[in-house]
Amino acid sequence: MAALAALLFSGQALANGHGSDAPPPPKPDATTAPARVILTKQGPKLVDLKGMTLYYYERDTSGKTSNCDGKCTQSWTPLSAPTDAKAVGDFTVITRNDGSKMWAYRYRPLYTSPADKEPGDTNGNATTLQWRIARPDE
């Protein structure tokens, strides 16, 4: 009986690709987009992975830097990216003036608003005319 169990186990291991001299298959790419598009009554918008609304800052014009520094970041939180982050589709990584990395969508830096308390809130949209909900078609 033990011999039969050993034979079945080794056959299953070989069927799964284990137990041979072949190298294991490569691991899937761990890079994922930092945000997603959701549909709302007002149209599609970008949200982070927690469902919080993302915003564009009108003063971010170059597409390669963020103009929200100092006190601005106390009111608007840049969507931070790991130091080794790479572009994923339309999501790019930019370097902020302080050297930290943040995510951008089509080279436009992305931020969250502390005025938004729950996923889907859009309270930051009403704070000033310089901030707008990030939409995939803009």
Predicted regions and their residues:
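Sec-dependent N-terminal signal peptides
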Residues: M1-A5
